[in-house]
Curated annotation (Swiss-Prot):
Functional pathway: Protein biosynthesis; polypeptide chain elongation
Biological role: Involved in peptide bond synthesis. Alleviates ribosome stalling that occurs when 3 or more consecutive Pro residues or the sequence PPG is present in a protein, possibly by augmenting the peptidyl transferase activity of the ribosome. Modification of Lys-34 is required for alleviation.
Modified residues (N6-(3,6-diaminohexanoyl)-5-hydroxylysine): 34
Organism, scientific name: Vibrio campbellii (strain ATCC BAA-1116)
Cytoplasm as UniProt keyword: yes
Entry GO CC: cytoplasm
Family under the similarity heading: Belongs to the elongation factor P family.
Keyword NAD: no
Listed name of the protein: Elongation factor P
One Pfam match: EFP
Main location: cytoplasm
Length: 188
């Protein structure tokens, strides 16, 4: 297996720790006035989603995780699995609800998602950064109601709830940032 030194650590690097694939979220190089330098690293375990902090002595090596990120199109959900397809080979992969997690509310048919595979099995599903969804339920915006600047909650076609401006009505299609679950704009 390939190894990587602590001086090559950076955000997004995938490592094997305790026989489990992890991704580095943050890396801080610390050189104290007295003693050996070290790296303080914030890591998320890909299988469980737990975030933890770990320190590595300068010069230590870690095994690189044998994970693969591929872009697949979301097809459908049959209640138990979420099905994705490779557009070039037409190969289909089924991901369970644990791999999809909270991202299920951002899955729209035919949208391209990034799937992380470990030993050929999907362990995480990342939706596109922006999705366009229809508003299925929201309170009507009253003319002249400018009291609150926070907007109003709106339920989208996938079941997700986001805060939208007062002028958004039922049936409109809006663009949402899936990373922050925030309204971006109306789609013409």
């Amino acid at each position: 297996m390939a190894t990587v030194s602590t001086n090559e650590f950076k955000g997004g690097l995938k490592l094997m720790l305790d026989n489990e694939p992890c991704v580095i979220l943050e890396n801080e190089y610390v050189k104290p006035g007295k003693g050996q330098a070290f790296n303080r690293v914030k890591i998320r375990k890909l299988l469980s989603g737990k975030v933890l902090e770990k320190t590595f002595k300068s010069g230590d090596t870690c095994e690189v995780a044998d994970v693969m990120d591929i872009d697949l199109d979301y097809l459908y959900s049959d209640g138990e699995f979420y099905h994705f397809m490779n557009n070039e080979t037409f190969e289909q992969i089924a991901a369970d609800a644990k791999a999809v997690g909270d991202n299920a509310k951002w899955l729209v048919e035919n949208n391209t998602c990034m799937i992380t595979l470990w030993n050929g099995n999907p362990i995480t599903v990342t939706p596109p950064n922006f999705v366009e969804l229809e508003v299925t339920d929201t309170d009507p915006g009253l003319k002249g109601d400018t009291q609150g600047t926070g907007g109003k909650p709106a339920t989208l076609s996938t079941g997700a709830v986001v805060r939208v401006p007062l002028f958004i009505a039922i049936g409109e299609v809006i663009k949402v940032d899936t990373r922050t679950a925030e309204y971006v704009g109306r789609v013409k």
